[in-house]
Amino acid sequence: GTIKIVHFSFKEFLEDNGFYKYCPEGGKHYVFVKVTNNLIDHTSEKEIKDFILNYLIKIDDLTVYNYFADQVRFFREEFLCLLSTIDIFFIEDTKDSAYLYYQNCAVKITNDKIEPIDYIDLGGYVWKDHIITRKFKMCEDISCDYKTFISNICANDIERTKTMESTIGFMMHGYKNLSYCPAVILNDE
């Protein structure tokens, strides 16, 4: 029989598998993205084509595979612009909390708590390239080589160590008050 692609069904299939357009805030041009469990990754026409062709290999339908392999127009930007534009709320640090992203979970850090959160429960999106390439593991022991190093460069002075820890925390934290932008300058004695 004749193979006919229903454009709307093809669009729905791609969106059901996480492919969308995204227009960055203040931008005029969109990019293609793939969303998986609140993680967003840039994608391209080539990666979308590879996804479709690999899917067709898995379902073992070479007739449709050959059709798509020949019909490059389905993977051009002009055709893929049919994808819906996704409205994205990115998780951001607040005055009272910061987030770090690991391979196995996100971690919400507040003054008195470190809380692992599954990405699906995060309540917003995260760029996949913001993920630290290791798994998060909660540690009961708070001593480590880095903490010893910071204490040593502060001459084991508790007050200086707290100041250095506060400075490092300030620089790592994503929330900034734009009316307060101090320069951090370190010098030795």
Mark where each language-model region is:
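Intein modules and their embedded homing endonuclease domains
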Residues: 1-124
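P-loop NTPase catalytic core of nucleic-acid-dependent motor ATPases
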Residues: 20-37, 41-46, 106-189
